Regions:
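Alpha-helical transmembrane segments of integral membrane proteins
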Residues: 17, 336-619
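Extracytosolic and intramembrane catalytic regions of membrane-associated proteins
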Residues: 68, 72-109, 141-142, 219-222, ...
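N-terminal Sec-pathway targeting helices
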Residues: 1-12, 524-530
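Transmembrane signal-anchor helices characteristic of membrane glycosylation enzymes that use polyprenol
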Residues: 15-29
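Alpha-helical transmembrane segments of integral membrane proteins, especially early/N-terminal helices
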Residues: 251, 287-295, 325-328, 357-365
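A broad structural signal for short, well-ordered beta-strand segments within beta-sheet-rich domains
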Residues: 114, 189, 480-481, 642, ...
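Juxtamembrane/start-of-transmembrane alpha-helix segments at the extracytoplasmic/lumenal side
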Residues: 313-332, 388-395
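Soluble extramembrane regions of membrane proteins in the secretory/endomembrane system
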Residues: 28-320, 672-680, 684-698
């Protein structure tokens, strides 16, 4: 028996207990040491390889000398394992935009009992220009090497195993495009396991799979000790700008799984993505995902990949999965359970309908309260930090503001319905959402189906027990709700950050709805007064305290623009958050301004005029051939060993295609941003290389004006003081600092 006066306290206690249990069961496994048996995966062995690969602790983008050095070290590691390998060196470009490079992919083979199809293990070995790349994607590379060592001991398997270490992933999946579109072995691959990383910690999860994934998911769950992943992430990933090499695999209609982690995201694409910062538990989880799964897949038939499955796990350590086509049946089962429960409980259908109407009010007040709190945080401080170095003010603000909003919703609802009516109304509203999600977002259906079936079953049982014991069953409806709502928040906090607080608040709102009937006995006015004071305190602390640390710095890039024709030079400090001292003192211009000659509408903030770099711009030699089409042959060089050369051609230039080496590419017209209205050709990894580029134009096109740029991460020496001050609690990110020299040319 649970007295109503204690019900709310028990519900809150149970919420924290269930959240803690779910959080504990989804942590990555402990790393295994050097004494681990040879046929098992050891994160320590893998980490030792990573330390030798990245001994310089410096970035190694495509085309750089250090990237080639690391490639040679990878060859040495494969030689130590006795695994034959080859190199693919070719020009290639991205699919979505013309970002091109001469890539150097590594392909290694562990022979099988048959010649094909291959099981491929894939990761990329290049980094962005600002990060050493231990997490992205050094951890994936060494996980494959350590797994390959163990696989080699037991080979041959039925299927041969291929290792693909791609180059130039960071500039648009270019290495993967080169392999899957140009290499003859690509057609011999049956399954790909891609391994990625984003940040420096977190569980290695199934990020996404190919469409027909029954064989893959069943093998994964059967063979892996700590399976982790939710199919709803596929729905999120479809709508995000992020990408991995697995996208190329999908476009090639090859089956597979994309594994990734996303913890400590402040380190992602920054100088903090180091060997010292990478969590060995994450590497261990990578290995425990791919090694046993590879052994299984390499040993079974792949004639039938089965149906499309949705999946979710771990939920308190348990994995759930079923055919996507079953989701509607399970939704109907939940409907039957709830209808029977309503009938047996003799609850008022009319009042339950009112409870349905109250449900979106509770969700809305919870979500709106959280939005208002973080809007005020942004208003007072000028920023919301994605991953603050000091987290507790943001976390308290999230908890207290949503609790405040949720209780406001409860106070409104209990004026119209009682506890039982609200309980049934809440789950009927959840059921409506379940059908909508099942139809429109099928990969996320299990997130809603599991809680409503569980609740429907408990509510039906409650109609057969004594009144004194019903409250226990009502409490237990929280058991399946927590992992599907609050249990996902920590992962979203780590992967999306507080700038995308909108990804978290709906989950909090849904849980507020489910727990709301259990809070009807609270003295809400007094409690909300206390919660309001906590919210205000967290808001003020979060607004007026410096929350940046060296481990979680503010991301700020330094951009230097020089128009070589006009003689104008500018410096811009680029950050998603408001600048603070001492960097703000370098900016003396308040109005936004166009800093490049080719785009008068793209305005930049946080800029100031600057001295010339005294650098020489890129060199150009051209040869024009007129025939059926106009062919222009260009030889391009950077006179300062810049990493990138960029060619801009206006949309009316008549450009139809271009060649790099023997590879023909289609130009892509930029439709937004700095390069809007231009065909943009990015030539990456140039440095001291001379690039021959052939451009095909419509035959009737005369000479056209274009822009040629070379871009380096090295800044002019007169910016040394600014560069020095941009350290400590500041850090570059992604492509980082850019020195851009621009000149107009005729073609």
């Amino acid at each position: 028996m649970v007295h109503k006066n204690y019900l709310s306290a028990l519900a809150i206690f149970l919420t924290f207990a269930l959240f803690s249990l779910q959080h504990f069961t989804t942590q990555p496994p402990s790393p295994k040491g050097l004494d681990t048996p040879e046929n098992e995966f050891s994160a320590v062995r893998a980490h030792n390889i990573l330390k030798s690969l990245l001994i310089e602790n410096k970035p190694h983008p495509v085309g750089s000398d250090l990237n080639r050095t690391i490639k040679e070290r990878l060859k040495d590691e494969l030689d130590k394992l006795g695994i034959q390998h080859q190199e693919q060196k070719t020009w290639a470009c991205a699919t979505r935009f013309a970002s091109c490079a001469e890539v150097e992919n590594l392909i290694a083979i562990i022979p099988g009992e048959t010649k094909s199809p291959y099981l491929a293990l894939m990761a990329h070995y290049d980094s962005v220009p600002m990060a050493p790349g231990a997490g992205d994607d050094g951890a994936g590379v060494v996980a494959i090497l350590e797994a390959a060592r163990a696989l080699k001991l037991e080979a041959p398997f039925k299927h041969p195993i291929m290792i693909i270490l791609t180059d130039a992933e960071e500039i648009g999946l270019v290495g993967a495009e080169a392999f899957f579109n140009q290499h003859p072995l690509a057609k011999e691959i049956g399954i790909v396991l891609n391994i990625e990383g984003s940040g420096s910690s977190g569980s290695s999860m199934v990020l996404r799979t190919s469409k027909k994934n029954e064989l893959l998911i069943k093998s994964y769950v059967h063979e892996t000790a700590r399976p982790y992943g939710f199919s709803f992430v596929k729905e999120i990933f479809k709508r995000m700008p992020n990408d991995t090499d697995f996208s190329v695999v999908n476009r090639s209609n090859i089956a597979g799984i994309d594994f990734a982690f996303a913890g400590e995201r402040n380190h992602y694409h920054t100088p903090n993505d180091t060997v010292d910062n990478i969590d060995l538990r994450t590497i261990q989880h990578h290995g425990e995902n791919i090694l046993p799964l590879s052994k299984n897949l390499a040993s079974v038939d792949w004639d039938d990949m089965g149906d499309e499955f949705i999946y979710g796990g771990e939920i308190y350590g348990f994995w759930t999965q079923w055919k996507t086509s079953y989701s509607l049946i399970f939704s109907l089962l939940a409907t039957l359970l709830l209808m029977l429960a309503i009938f047996k409980s003799k609850v008022s259908v009319k009042k339950s309908a009112v409870g349905i109407l109250m449900s979106p009010i509770i969700v809305s007040t919870t979500v709106l309260s959280g939005f208002i709190a973080f809007y005020l945080l942004s208003f007072l401080s000028g920023k919301v930090i994605s991953w603050p170095g000091i987290e507790w003010p943001y976390r308290i603000l999230l908890i207290s503001s949503t609790a405040l909003g949720g209780l406001i919703g409860v106070s409104i609802a209990r004026k119209f319905v009682n506890q039982i009516e609200m309980l049934f109304g809440a789950w009927l509203f959840w059921l409506i959402l379940t059908f909508l999600i099942t139809i429109y977002l099928p990969d996320a259906a299990n997130t809603f189906i599991l809680p409503v079936i569980f609740a429907g079953f408990l509510l039906l049982i409650s109609s057969f027990v004594k009144e004194d014991n019903k409250q226990i069953l009502f409490l237990l409806t929280l058991v399946m709700s927590v992992p599907m709502t609050l249990g996902l928040i920590f992962s979203l906090e780590q992967s999306q950050g507080y700038k995308l607080i909108g990804a978290v608040l709906p989950l909090v709102g849904l849980y507020a709805l489910i727990i709301s009937p259990l809070l009807f006995s609270l003295k809400i006015k007094l409690i909300n007064l206390c919660i309001g004071l906590v919210t205000i305190s967290a808001l003020l602390i979060g607004s007026y305290t410096n929350l940046y640390t060296e481990d979680r710095p503010q991301h700020v890039n330094i951009y230097f623009y020089e128009d070589l024709d006009a003689g104008n030079s500018y410096v811009q400090l680029s950050s998603q958050e408001s600048l603070i001292e001492p960097l703000v003192s370098y900016i003396n211009e308040e109005k936004a301004k166009a800093l490049v000659p080719f785009s008068g509408e793209y305005l930049s903030e946080n800029w100031t005029q600057s001295a010339s770099s005294e650098w020489q711009g890129p060199s150009l030699e051209k040869q024009i051939e007129l025939g059926e089409n106009k062919l222009v042959k260009l030889k391009l060089n950077s006179n300062r060993s810049a990493s990138r050369i960029v060619l801009l051609l206006p949309k009316d230039s008549g450009l139809t295609s271009f060649y790099l080496g023997s590879v023909k590419m289609k130009p892509v017209l930029s439709s937004w941003g700095l390069y809007e209205g231009y065909y943009v050709i990015y030539l990456n990894g140039i440095y001291n290389k001379e690039v021959e580029l052939k451009l095909n134009f419509d035959a009737n096109k005369s000479e056209v004006s274009a822009y040629l740029m070379d871009i380096s991460t090295k800044l002019p020496s007169h910016l040394d003081e600014l560069y020095k001050d941009r350290s400590g609690i500041f850090s570059p990110v992604h492509r980082g600092d850019q020195a851009i020299l621009i000149k107009k040319i005729s073609i």
